Regions:
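Thiol-based oxidoreductase modules, predominantly thioredoxin-like and allied folds used
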Residues: 6, 25-39
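Residues that form or immediately flank small-molecule/cofactor binding pockets and catalytic motifs
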Residues: 9, 34, 74
Length: 78
């Protein structure tokens, strides 16, 4: 499952959600200011510089984590 870190009024975020819907990819949305703060996001994904931030849920030794994929451009390549 993918996780889309989004923010309000973000056309690229909306495009990422639409792309997932069109491809039939299961995804969850986390919204800035509701589900997380910018500081929390930068702590978890320090290399991310723009929205949306796309992550995939993975399990390592039974622990569920989110692995950074990239942004909309990288999502289009998946």
């Amino acid at each position: 499952m993918l996780v889309i870190y989004s923010k309000d009024n973000c056309q690229q975020c909306d495009s990422a959600k639409l792309l997932c819907q069109m491809k039939g990819v299961e995804y969850a949305v986390k919204t800035l200011g509701i589900d997380y703060t910018r500081e929390q996001l930068m702590h978890v994904f320090p290399k991310a510089r723009s929205f949306p931030i796309i992550a995939v849920k993975v399990k390592y030794d039974g622990v569920e984590m989110e692995e950074y994929i990239g942004g909309l451009t990288e999502l289009k390549e998946v």
